[in-house]
Curated annotation (Swiss-Prot):
It comes from Mycobacterium tuberculosis (strain CDC 1551 / Oshkosh). One of its GO terms (cellular component) is extracellular region. Belongs to the WXG100 family. CFP-10 subfamily. Its main location: secreted. It is found in: Secreted. Gene3D superfamilies: ESAT-6-like. Keywords: Secreted. InterPro entries: ESAT-6-like_sf, T7SS_ESAT-6-like. It comes from the Bacteria. This is ESAT-6-like protein EsxW. Forms a tight 1:1 complex with EsxV.
Length: 98
């Protein structure tokens, strides 16, 4: 399988935008899931069942938070690398033109 490196800063920023959209989607769905769990929690659940459900939902919420953080990390890395690539390309052009 051939590896392809992304060297187009505009494409890198576009891809970063996609990662931001994915992060927002995960965050929105996690928020809905948490709200739903809170609604269920008061609907006749009590004792160990409610505590276990809340613990599970808390762990899942943290897992989703970790996913969002990773997606933001990829987004930030793509933007940073696009900026670095442009700066290096500019420096190379200046060296070649002198």
């Amino acid at each position: 399988m051939t590896s392809r490196f992304m060297t187009d800063p505009h494409a890198m920023r576009d891809m970063a935008g996609r990662f931001e959209v994915h992060a927002q989607t995960v965050e929105d769905e996690a928020r809905r899931m948490w709200a739903s769990a809170q609604n269920i929690s008061g609907a006749g659940w009590s004792g160990m069942a409610e505590a276990t459900s809340l613990d599970t939902m808390t762990q899942m919420n943290q897992a989703f938070r970790n996913i969002v953080n990773m997606l933001h990390g990829v987004r930030d890395g793509l933007v940073r690398d696009a900026n670095n690539y442009e700066q290096q390309e500019q420096a190379s052009q200046q060296i070649l033109s002198s």
